[in-house]
């Protein structure tokens, strides 16, 4: 009789573990799917911005991997900073694409995305004070529009992360998550530095 009870308890635990694991895997897949949409929109922003670079900067951007940038050819420090930000954001998106639940990868995406927004804000201010800049109307408007299209996607990603993180930290699924090394995911910061 006790063997039957023990077997029943083991069976319940086994089926619970399989169900909990499947739920966690589905939630992880949901986070990855939502990040794919965010990634696609951020890539649109990158491609659009790279396509609107002055020709001399576009040529340098394509040669960045082969040699150091000739700083003398750049108009100002802000242009050099933009090329670095674009390269960093592209690299961080590449990493996050392969590890959409990695907190470190998402922190880097957040950092680089916000650095791009800060660059745009500095360029708009520079244009308003009469400093030379190629980032003039209608470019800031279009940049803001592309960024705004990413916000609902980032909200959907953050909601998926919240569901996943709740499941990973909720007892008793948290014990299973620790066993299979499912860590909480990082949310995207959807603060707007241009507001």
Name every feature range the model reports, one short phrase each.
Residues 2-195:
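A helix-centric hydrophobic-segment signal that preferentially recognizes long
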């Amino acid at each position: 009789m006790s063997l039957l009870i023990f077997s029943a308890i083991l069976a319940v635990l086994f089926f619970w573990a399989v169900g909990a694991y499947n739920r966690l895997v589905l939630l992880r897949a949901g986070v990855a799917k939502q990040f794919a949409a965010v990634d696609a929109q951020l890539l649109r922003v990158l491609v659009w911005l790279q396509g609107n670079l002055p020709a001399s900067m576009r040529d340098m951007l394509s040669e960045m991997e082969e040699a150091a940038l000739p700083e003398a050819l750049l108009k100002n420090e802000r242009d050099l900073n933009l090329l670095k930000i674009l390269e960093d954001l592209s690299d961080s998106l590449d990493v996050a694409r392969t590890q959409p639940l990695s907190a470190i990868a998402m922190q880097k995406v957040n950092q680089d995305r916000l650095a791009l927004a800060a660059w745009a804000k500095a360029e708009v201010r520079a244009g308003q004070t009469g400093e030379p800049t190629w980032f003039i109307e209608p470019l800031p408007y279009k940049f803001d529009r592309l960024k705004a299209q990413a916000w609902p996607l980032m909200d959907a990603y953050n909601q998926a992360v919240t569901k996943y993180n709740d499941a990973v930290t909720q007892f008793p699924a948290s014990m299973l998550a620790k066993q299979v090394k499912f860590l909480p995911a990082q949310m995207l910061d959807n603060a707007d530095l241009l507001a």
